[in-house]
């Protein structure tokens, strides 16, 4: 399954091809790929066709396409121009909890976001816990169990279409194609853009989905609402506090999208190896110093993978069909039974949270 670096790479590849383009046609080849309130082909097409794309971003493992259907946030009373500036797009994405796709060297610079548009260091959108380990107070998104105010009620009644959310799951791919390219055998949805460019959502195993999101449906979507903080945007203290107060094996917690968003099997194994932590260690037994080290190594691994355009094991390709290269740098993932590249000990395998896990019994304690 594509993880944070792969989805970030795809978003960066799609951004120049999609931004500013209008969607002039939608063809749904597999209705089961549509999810959410607007999940019939007719409703989905009506909501999406004619929308202009403002930007492409990411939240956890979700790839997000934001539409230019709202006036610029923070510029009340001023109409949104057809030529979208980067500042208005950024405002739009920040307000609705999107993370704008950056480049390999700047992706981590995005600020932690709140869904109401406030930027609050150490907190995240729609989640009950702050990144700093403290509880959030005040208004939250409808349906989170928090305090409702007039803004929250307005969100609950607002069906303005915000954009598209893609979850690629195991075999989902998003490709840019030239005009008149025919749909393939695994193409599930086609988006035709002005100028003739075509965006294909391909998915061989049909586990992936695309969801047309409105302000209301976004606020009420449990998966979105419960996503944990972005690992590239947390500070070490908050990351450590978040893990230390939970009981469970450290790798299982890293894989839990409610705890940390975007981390999967590859980057959990690789970061735990670099931190010298066995993946089956109970998180609450780790010292703050070891959790701080894990935080740093996790960020390093994610950034290095983004710089290499992700990891291509079987199905992953970027928006132009190219493979990533970080798999060439794996120290443990997929190398069970082979010698550790650090000490030469045979790498062991185990099952953690239902996932095959590789670690070094000598280097990881």
From Swiss-Prot:
Q: What top-level branch of life does the organism fall under?
A: Bacteria
Q: How does it assemble?
A: Monomer.
User: Active site annotated at which positions?
Assistant: 2 (schiff-base intermediate with dna), 3 (proton donor), 61 (proton donor), 355 (proton donor)
Name of a matching Pfam family: Fapy_DNA_glyco
Q: Is the Hydrolase keyword given for this protein?
A: yes
Zinc fingers, FPG-type, are found at 331-365
Q: Where is the composition biased (Polar residues)?
A: 134-150
| Keywords (A to Z) from UniProt | DNA damage, DNA repair, DNA-binding, Glycosidase, Hydrolase, Lyase, Metal-binding, Multifunctional enzyme, Zinc, Zinc-finger
E.C. designation(s):
3.2.2.23, 4.2.99.18
GO MF term list = 8-oxo-7,8-dihydroguanine DNA N-glycosylase activity; class I DNA-(apurinic or apyrimidinic site) endonuclease activity; damaged DNA binding; zinc ion binding
**Which purpose does this protein serve, as stated in its record?**
Involved in base excision repair of DNA damaged by oxidation or by mutagenic agents. Acts as a DNA glycosylase that recognizes and removes damaged bases. Has a preference for oxidized purines, such as 7,8-dihydro-8-oxoguanine (8-oxoG). Has AP (apurinic/apyrimidinic) lyase activity and introduces nicks in the DNA strand. Cleaves the DNA backbone by beta-delta elimination to generate a single-strand break at the site of the removed base with both 3'- and 5'-phosphates.
Identify its protein family: Belongs to the FPG family.
Stored InterPro entries:
DNA_glyclase/AP_lyase_DNA-bd (IPR015886), DNA_glyclase_Znf_dom_DNA_BS (IPR015887), Formamido-pyr_DNA_Glyclase (IPR020629), FPG_cat (IPR012319), MutM-like_N-ter (IPR035937), Ribosomal_uS13-like_H2TH (IPR010979), Znf_DNA_glyclase/AP_lyase (IPR000214), Znf_FPG/IleRS (IPR010663)
Q: Which organism's genome codes for this protein?
A: Nitratidesulfovibrio vulgaris (strain ATCC 29579 / DSM 644 / CCUG 34227 / NCIMB 8303 / VKM B-1760 / Hildenborough)
Needed cofactors, names only, are: Zn(2+)
Question: What disulfide bonds does the UniProt entry report for this chain?
Answer: none
What detail does the entry give on cofactor binding?
Answer: Binds 1 zinc ion per subunit.
Q: Which reaction is the catalytic activity of this chain?
A: Hydrolysis of DNA containing ring-opened 7-methylguanine residues, releasing 2,6-diamino-4-hydroxy-5-(N-methyl)formamidopyrimidine; 2'-deoxyribonucleotide-(2'-deoxyribose 5'-phosphate)-2'-deoxyribonucleotide-DNA = a 3'-end 2'-deoxyribonucleotide-(2,3-dehydro-2,3-deoxyribose 5'-phosphate)-DNA + a 5'-end 5'-phospho-2'-deoxyribonucleoside-DNA + H(+)
Query: Where does the record place the region Disordered?
Result: 121-150
Q: Which GO terms describe its biological process?
A: base-excision repair
Q: Which HAMAP family match?
A: Fapy_DNA_glycosyl
Q: Where on this chain does DNA bind?
A: 186, 205, 246
PANTHER family named in the record? FORMAMIDOPYRIMIDINE-DNA GLYCOSYLASE
Q: What is this protein called?
A: Formamidopyrimidine-DNA glycosylase
């Amino acid at each position: 399954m594509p993880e944070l670096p792969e989805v970030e790479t795809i978003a960066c590849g799609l951004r120049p091809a999609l931004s500013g383009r209008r969607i002039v046609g939608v063809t749904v080849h597999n209705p089961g790929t549509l999810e959410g309130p607007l999940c019939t082909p007719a409703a989905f097409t009506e909501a999406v066709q004619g929308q202009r794309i403002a930007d492409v971003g990411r939240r956890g493992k979700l790839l997000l396409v934001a539409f230019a259907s709202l006036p610029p946030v923070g510029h009340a009373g001023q109409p949104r121009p057809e030529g979208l500036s980067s500042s208005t797009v950024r405002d739009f994405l920040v307000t609705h909890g999107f993370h704008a796709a950056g480049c390999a060297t700047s992706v981590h610079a995005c600020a932690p976001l709140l869904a109401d548009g406030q930027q609050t260091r150490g907190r995240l959108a729609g989640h009950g816990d702050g990144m700093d380990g403290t509880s959030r107070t005040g208004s939250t998104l409808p349906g989170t169990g928090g305090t409702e105010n007039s803004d929250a009620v307005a969100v609950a009644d607002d069906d303005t279409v915000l954009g598209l959310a893609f979850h690629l799951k195991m075999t989902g791919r998003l490709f840019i194609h030239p005009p008149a390219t025919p749909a393939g055998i695994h193409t599930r949805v086609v988006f035709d853009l002005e100028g003739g460019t075509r965006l294909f959502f391909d998915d061989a195993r049909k586990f992936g989905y695309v969801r047309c999101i409105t302000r209301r449906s976004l606020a009420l979507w449990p998966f979105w609402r419960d996503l944990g903080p972005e690992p590239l945007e947390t500070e070490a203290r908050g990351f450590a506090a978040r893990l230390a107060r939970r009981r469970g094996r450290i790798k299982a917690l890293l894989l839990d999208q409610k705890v940390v968003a975007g981390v999967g099997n590859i980057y959990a194994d690789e970061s735990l190896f670099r931190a010298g932590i066995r993946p089956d260690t109970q998180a609450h037994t780790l010292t703050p110093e070891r959790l701080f080290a894990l935080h740093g190594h996790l960020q390093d691994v994610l950034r290095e993978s983004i710089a290499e355009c992700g990891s291509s094991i079987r199905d992953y390709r970027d928006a132009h069909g190219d493979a990533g290269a970080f798999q060439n740098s794996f120290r443990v993932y997929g190398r069970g039974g082979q010698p550790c590249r650090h000490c030469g000990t045979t790498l062991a395998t185990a099952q953690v949270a239902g996932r095959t896990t590789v670690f070094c019994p000598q280097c990881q304690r």
